[in-house]
Amino acid sequence: MAGYISDDTRKVTTHRLVEMKQRGERISMLTSYDYTMAQIVDGAGMDVILVGDSASNVMAGNVTTLPITLDQMIYHAKSVVRGVKRAMVVVDMPFGSYQGNEMEGLASAIRIMKESHADALKLEGGEEIIDTVKRIISAGIPVMGHLGLMPQSINKYGTYTVRAKDDSEAEKLIRDAHLLEEAGCFAIVLEKIPATLAERVASELTIPIIGIGAGGHVDGQVLVIQDMLGMNNGFRPRFLRRYADLYTVMTDAISRYVSDVKNCDFPNEKEQY
């Protein structure tokens, strides 16, 4: 079945995302970490490309997102920005780059923006980081919030289970979402929370709510690209829809290349100078 390709070549901005919510148009968002993949994702009509700290997992093989550094995030962000013409590029601020105090967070934010030429940043947390969020936004840097399951806090929670299932945590999430909007965030990611709660947040806020494992009654969806392309063979969470099985496709292609080299079938006469 043919996919969706936008004929609108205008650069996606924070204002356009808000307009999309207002007219009921869903926002598409995927991760990318390198130039080649970013070109493909942008060319396919993606609205937002997230240079996620999930690069720590899918690119570097770490168990959590915690080890990735500011320098490494800037490297990935630079590579992605070079490959993008239309999509908005949002960069995750890595663990340790903004949790200390607001001035350290601002310095990290300015460095990412100056060196990568990205369009916006994403931070995990609510009330506990609100002063940092305000400081970054006051410097003219657009900020996307992130609530619910927050992978940078995995050592606090101990598990990647669904968050905000009890009333107290759900009410805190709602309060935090309003605080982030009031602080000036242009959008919020809600990760792995009950669909009814995500729907409530999306209905109460005027800014876009992007879900990952947060149901279908939000303003957009985000996934890790390796997951939706089926490159991580053993990763099959309930919220994931796999649009390809690239693990099998790539393994087959590589094994055929190995076979051709071993059997002296590659290169042939037409593939030589």
Swiss-Prot record:
InterPro entries attached to this UniProt entry: Pantoate_hydroxy_MeTrfase (IPR003700), Pyrv/PenolPyrv_kinase-like_dom (IPR015813), Pyrv_kinase-like_dom_sf (IPR040442)
GO biological process terms held by the UniProt record: pantothenate biosynthetic process
Active-site residues per Swiss-Prot or TrEMBL entry: 191 (proton acceptor)
Record-listed E.C. numbers: 2.1.2.11
Amino-acid positions noted as binding 3-methyl-2-oxobutanoate in the UniProt annotation, renumbered to this chain: 53-54, 92, 122
Reactions the enzyme catalyzes: 3-methyl-2-oxobutanoate + (6R)-5,10-methylene-5,6,7,8-tetrahydrofolate + H2O = 2-dehydropantoate + (6S)-5,6,7,8-tetrahydrofolate
Entry's cofactor comment: Binds 1 Mg(2+) ion per subunit.
First and last residue of the signal peptide: none
Cofactor: Mg(2+)
Lineage top rank: taxon: Bacteria
Cytoplasm found in the keyword field: yes
Main location group: cytoplasm
Family: Belongs to the PanB family.
Name of the protein in its database record: 3-methyl-2-oxobutanoate hydroxymethyltransferase
UniProt source species: Bacteroides thetaiotaomicron (strain ATCC 29148 / DSM 2079 / JCM 5827 / CCUG 10774 / NCTC 10582 / VPI-5482 / E50)
Taxon lineage: Bacteria, Pseudomonadati, Bacteroidota, Bacteroidia, Bacteroidales
